[in-house]
C-alpha cells in the first residue's frame, strides 16, 4: 500500500478509490498492529504515525482508514450518514438474548463529517409494529427478534438504520469492567431503586459495570420517568464513546472482541469496523443527544406513550446523522 502497488484485489471498492490518488513512500514504514475478532471474523487496526488502516481477515482486505502521510486527506469509512440500533435485552438467566423485550433502544448515528448523535426511544412508545398490529415499541423483539426491532424503529423514525448490536445486563457489566469502567460526569445524584437503592452520586467519576447498569436502568425515582432513563442511557453511550476516542483506533479490535463474547449483531466485520472507527473521527462539539418523547396515555390497562410533533421533529433533525 505504501509502495504504491495495486490494491484492486486487497481492498474494498471504497478504500481502493480513496487510495487511488495516494503518493507512494520510499523507504521503510514503521507500523503497529492490533488484531481482534468480530463474531468470528478477524479484524485489525494498523497505525503508522497519523495513518490508520482498517483490515478484515482472514485474507486481510483493507476496508477503510485515513492516510495523511500519503496525501489522502479524507477518511474512507464507508460514507455517511449511517445509523446503528443499540439494544439492551431484558433477558434473564436462561432466557434467549434476542427474543425478550428490549430494555434499551438507542439509535447511534454518524454523519461522515465529524458529527453524530444518540437518540433514545422510550420503551412505552405505542407504535405500529413490523410484526403486525400496534404495541409498545420494545415488544417487536419478542415477536420477531432484533431484525423486527430494527424494522419497527426504521418505520417509526424514517431513518435507514443499518443494523443492530444487542447486549444483556450481564454482558454489559462485563464489558464495562473489562474496559476499566466508564468515566462520566453525573449531573444529579440517582438512587437506583431496582438495584438495592444503589446511590450514584453527582459529579465526575468512573462507573463500574454494576454502577453504569444501575444508572442506565433507573426509572422510578426520576421525575421524568422513562424519558429520564433513556436520557441516562444516552449519557452512558456518549461517555463510553469519549473514552474509546481517547484510547485511539488501535484499541478497537480489543473492544470488538470483548463485545463478540457476550453480544449479538447482524453487522458485518467491515460495517462495524468502519462505523466504530467513524466514532473516533467525531468532534465532541458536533455530537448531540435526544429522546423521542410524547404524551402519556392508555391502551386498555397498559400505560403508553403516544408520539407527538416533538418526536417527529427529532426524527427529521437526525436524518443527516447529526443531532448537534
Question: What are the roles of these predicted feature ranges?
Answer:
Residues 1-324:
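Non-catalytic, solvent-exposed segments at the cell envelope interface
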